[in-house]
């Protein structure tokens, strides 16, 4: 008899590996995971905030139209619907835009989902400044700070499409709400392996190093790895932690890095206040004071322009990470 579980005892995926690897964009990998979760559990339903095509949900809509609700450009309604469904034992998964699902529906998110500790998963596409050309209304550079301050909320920022798949599938283990920040309509470099172990709340050490540590999440993980590779040629060992879970933070990994390498650089496509940098700084300030630099957006609204130009303007990339590492090494 053919086994229906994998080595870890989890149900085997019906989604072909090639399809996950071909996704290349975290929003599409999340959509594939939604369909897979729905195949495993009839209580899973998707709620779209005018994002069916953004998340690649059309095949799911055609296969299970009764389990996909189109709320339209009405994030407050989407969040309220999800909270209501969760109270009946359903497992709603919201698919929305990061800048809107975290601000427009904040009251419902806080009171109906987080306060009530409802089992609602929020997939938030276009996090950071991937929609920078659309102006300040479409920048999502405070979403992690908002979500970190919601009791009961798990906050995940996958490094690539492959890790997004694992993050979404891992929400089966959660009994409360979860926010997963995703990218936009750009291919994302692969920095993780599809067969890599993924655990909520446990950082991935992508590069070894004893001189300094870069702790990064999301879009800045790849530049962090590139920095480590470049500085290795100069004899500088840069440890790279992919801190995919912002909350709960992997305290052990952060504190070990502080003790073993003596200096920390954080890197995120988010304001330096309240996100990954803030979480790491709060921990180090109370447990292990350590020299530190934070790469991210300053306390201002971002300029408008192509994402690459905005990243360069605010020094959110490999060059800035490298400079911060060298500065701390002096």
Q: Model regions: which residues?
A:
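Thiamine diphosphate
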Residues: 1-181, 186, 197, 318, ...
């Amino acid at each position: 008899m053919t086994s229906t579980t994998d080595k870890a005892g989890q149900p085997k995926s019906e989604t072909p590996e090639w399809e996950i690897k071909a996704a290349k964009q975290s929003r599409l990998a999340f959509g594939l995971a939604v369909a897979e979760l729905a195949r495993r559990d009839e209580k899973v339903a998707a709620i779209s905030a005018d994002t069916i095509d953004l998340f690649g949900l059309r095949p799911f809509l055609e296969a299970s139209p009764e389990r996909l609700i189109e709320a339209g450009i009405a994030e407050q309604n989407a969040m309220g619907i999800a909270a209501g469904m969760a109270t009946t034992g359903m497992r709603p998964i919201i698919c929305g835009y990061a800048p809107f699902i975290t601000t427009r529906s904040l009251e419902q998110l806080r009171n109906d989902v987080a306060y009530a500790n409802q089992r609602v998963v929020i997939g938030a596409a276009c996090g950071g400044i991937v929609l920078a050309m659309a102006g300040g209304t479409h920048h999502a550079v405070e979403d992690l700070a908002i979500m970190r301050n919601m009791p009961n909320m798990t906050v995940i920022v996958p490094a690539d499409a492959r890790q997004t798949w694992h993050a979404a599938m891992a929400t089966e283990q959660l009994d409360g709400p979860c926010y997963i920040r995703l990218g936009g309509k750009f291919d994302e470099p692969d920095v993780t392996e599809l067969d890599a172990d993924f655990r909520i709340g446990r950082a991935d050490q992508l590069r070894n190093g004893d001189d300094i540590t870069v702790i990064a999440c999301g879009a800045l993980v790849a530049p962090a790895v590139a920095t480590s590779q470049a500085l290795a040629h100069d004899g500088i060992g840069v440890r790279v932690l992919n801190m995919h879970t912002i909350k709960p933070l992997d305290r052990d990994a952060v504190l070990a890095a502080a003790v073993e390498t003596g200096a920390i650089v954080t890197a995120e496509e988010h304001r330096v206040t309240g996100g990954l940098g803030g979480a790491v700084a709060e921990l180090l300030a109370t447990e292990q004071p350590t020299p530190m630099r934070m790469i991210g957006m300053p306390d201002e609204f971002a300029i408008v322009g192509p994402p690459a130009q905005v990243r360069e303007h605010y020094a959110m990339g490999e060059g800035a990470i490298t400079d911060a590492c060298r500065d701390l090494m002096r």
